[in-house]
């Protein structure tokens, strides 16, 4: 399961709701080195990320907020091997595409909300880098527009749906033979 969206679009909130509704869902904790939040990550060093990259052990890596993040094959496989449905949080279309090489039925979900909602949610949760979150919202919008034919299973406006409604829509998509297809991204992001 891939939840793609800008900061404040509800990735954490909807993941929490998914895990509340079904015990087999689990947040995939990306590797992280650098400042900022630590909850929801496996903290490591840049040296360990580099070593995994050289060994072909990474599906994707990126930098944002002065930190480095990575999705490792071994960590993802370990979660799947326990019978869990991994929920990956993504902020780049390239990352959502890169992890698709991992052999799993990927449900690809765009979570979207307007800029003012991202800003209000960021302030509401006490982020000290609201400006960086707003900048990332713009980057995510541009990323989506640059890849508007990228296939997605669902697009959800999280400012128009409750977390429970969003989670149930995702569960339905996972349970159904839903396939990813191009969506009207320009209409979604305005």
Residue ranges and their predicted role:
Residues 9:
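ATP-binding Walker
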